[in-house]
Amino acid sequence: MESPIRFENVDINTILKTLPHRFPFLLIDRVINIREDYSGIGIKNVTVNEPAFQGHFPERPVYPGVLMIEGMAQTAGVIGILSVTGTEKPRAVYFLTIDKCKFRKPVMPGDTVEYHLTRTGRRKTMWWFHGEAKVDGQIVAEADVGAMLAD
């Protein structure tokens, strides 16, 4: 008999214990629906107080697409670290690859971005994921990203 699929949710406190990233470069607020090292959804609440909006663009703030890609990578890092270590002890995680990146719609202050990550490959402590950034169910960006744990 197969064991039931277990979903996990982690809050900002667990993310802070898991990733080495800190303000202003911690770009996810929580990760929900983590299914082992296979999938999960990172959540980012975008506010007008984001440091990037000081220059991107003051008169019409648009959340930078590259920060959404980093949010996908951080979500992948949380999924990977928690699946391997099973603890909340920080380890270094590196952004390994980015492919097939597309930006489809602008993200504005007040939006909540969901980073939907699904594993497409794995080798030891390296993972590759397909990521879709969604706002209100619509894809605003997508990319294939890779992450690697380092000792």
Curated annotation (Swiss-Prot):
SUPFAM superfamilies: Thioesterase/thiol ester dehydrase-isomerase. Keywords: Cytoplasm, Lipid A biosynthesis, Lipid biosynthesis, Lipid metabolism, Lyase. It catalyses: a (3R)-hydroxyacyl-[ACP] = a (2E)-enoyl-[ACP] + H2O. The keyword DNA repair does not apply. Its EC number is 4.2.1.59. It holds the Pfam family FabA. It comes from the Bacteria. The keyword Zinc does not apply. The active site is at H56. One of its GO terms (biological process) is lipid A biosynthetic process. It is found in: Cytoplasm. One of its GO terms (cellular component) is cytoplasm. GO terms for molecular function: (3R)-hydroxyacyl-[acyl-carrier-protein] dehydratase activity. Involved in unsaturated fatty acids biosynthesis. Catalyzes the dehydration of short chain beta-hydroxyacyl-ACPs and long chain saturated and unsaturated beta-hydroxyacyl-ACPs. Belongs to the thioester dehydratase family. FabZ subfamily. NCBIfam families: fabZ, PRK00006.1. This is 3-hydroxyacyl-[acyl-carrier-protein] dehydratase FabZ. It comes from Rhodopseudomonas palustris (strain TIE-1). The lineage of its organism: Bacteria, Pseudomonadati, Pseudomonadota, Alphaproteobacteria, Hyphomicrobiales.
